[in-house]
Amino acid sequence: CASVIKADDYDEALHLANDTDFGLSAGICTTSLKYATDFRKNSKAGMVMVNLPTAGVDYHVPFGGRKGSSYGPREQGGYAREFYTIVKTSYISA
């Protein structure tokens, strides 16, 4: 299940993405590198997609969410030693 919500401007889009109890993945469609970079940094999700679907992951990168999603340590790779860090996986399609 996926949802698409149209926002009036970038600030509203970021607010909508973060205004949830869950944080497995978030995405934004934009032609602005400025907004893509800001969304990647300020989205409160474990995985961030820009101009890509939010479903599906590469299995060789750390996988996990924030907030009420995917509670606990991230899966895959050497993430076990980085247990106390915050990692965000980002994708941008030009």
Where is each model-derived feature located?
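Conserved C-terminal structural/oligomerization subdomain of aldehyde/semialdehyde dehydrogenase
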Residues: C1-A94
